[in-house]
Swiss-Prot record:
PROSITE patterns: TUBULIN, TUBULIN_B_AUTOREG. Its cofactor is Mg(2+). It comes from Trypanosoma brucei rhodesiense. CDD domains: beta_tubulin (cd02187). Dimer of alpha and beta chains. A typical microtubule is a hollow water-filled tube with an outer diameter of 25 nm and an inner diameter of 15 nM. Alpha-beta heterodimers associate head-to-tail to form protofilaments running lengthwise along the microtubule wall with the beta-tubulin subunit facing the microtubule plus end conferring a structural polarity. Microtubules usually have 13 protofilaments but different protofilament numbers can be found in some organisms and specialized cells. Tubulin is the major constituent of microtubules, a cylinder consisting of laterally associated linear protofilaments composed of alpha- and beta-tubulin heterodimers. Microtubules grow by the addition of GTP-tubulin dimers to the microtubule end, where a stabilizing cap forms. Below the cap, tubulin dimers are in GDP-bound state, owing to GTPase activity of alpha-tubulin. This is Tubulin beta chain.
Amino acid sequence: MREIVCVQAGQCGNQIGSKFWEVISDEHGVDPTGTYQGDSDLQLERINVYFDEATGGRYVPRSVLIDLEPGTMDSVRAGPYGQIFRPDNFIFGQSGAGNNWAKGHYTEGAELIDSVLDVCCKEAESCDCLQGFQICHSLGGGTGSGMGTLLISKLREQYPDRIMMTFSIIPSPKVSDTVVEPYNTTLSVHQLVENSDESMCIDNEALYDICFRTLKLTTPTFGDLNHLVSAVVSGVTCCLRFPGQLNSDLRKLAVNLVPFPRLHFFMMGFAPLTSRGSQQYRGLSVPELTQQMFDAKNMMQAADPRHGRYLTASALFRGRMSTKEVDEQMLNVQNKNSSYFIEWIPNNIKSSVCDIPPKGLKMAVTFIGNNTCIQEMFRRVGEQFTLMFRRKAFLHWYTGEGMDEMEFTEAESNMNDLVSEYQQYQDATIEEEGEFDEEEQY
């Protein structure tokens, strides 16, 4: 029941995805060949959320791996869990998108999309009751952004009532991987606003900061960053996979976190994060976790929650703890920091408790927040977009693939609208809410 199909698009998506499968397989006691080696019935009880059982009791991930060049696929296959995936679920082109959104969305990607949809439908048909799709991709490149958004809109057509959840790696402010990032990101956000139900925004720079500051790693690698992300991804779905006192699923998350349909871009955090050396000096308790969870340094985006206000938030606790204590702490946070929470949504933190903690921890918590400060990120990308678009820099790469300048203008204005919507709800007070209604009546 409640299966999730995981789609990984582009290099970034596949690398995060393969790390994620390592974490999930470890939690469920599945070894790299797909055989169950665990010691607890709880691991098997709902293993079918992410795994399909094949002949001979072998567990196969419900995963679709897409890329427009074969390179990443080879490194996934060569990785520790490379042999666990179904070979038919690797779908790749030969040419690569070359960091070009138009190639991923209109030319190269469009040629592959039918075979990708076939595999996705096969995976969906083997499910009892499909909960939704989870898509890992980056917005700065060509494949993850262009082809990823194309796939999302196609899946939306076929499965209109299923949850579409994306884990989107947003370009970071100081570190840029490609020059045309602002173009690719803006065009992607334009699609995500319309077609996804929940988008978790993650950015590399914030992840680097967490590794460097909190975990005290001197030279963090992409492997370390991806491990952080996969801890959160597994935390979001742990209620589906293990028994809990207070369950949540993707749909409950969406219902509780999205007050207005367009504002579905979330920040994520994870606690406890401590460096190896100082682990034994810290106690794990619900107050301690709550404190770290709301800490700005723990957020996986380069946006400061103190600059905005929380529309809604969700805390997914894992481990043995009293639900009473969880409720008290959540109430406590809201009362003490009431200025950072929107006052016209009372009780805006959803909490859930799952009994099984992650491997090697007694308790942990995953945090998902819908904060208006995420507009900083879109605003930053929008400014970079405008600077380049005003001079029409690099545009010929996109128009050459059949795109129109009009599309760029549309995407830009859609993203600017998103920013101003966030700003509007950040400034709104209870008194003003009444005025909005009155204006509509005349």
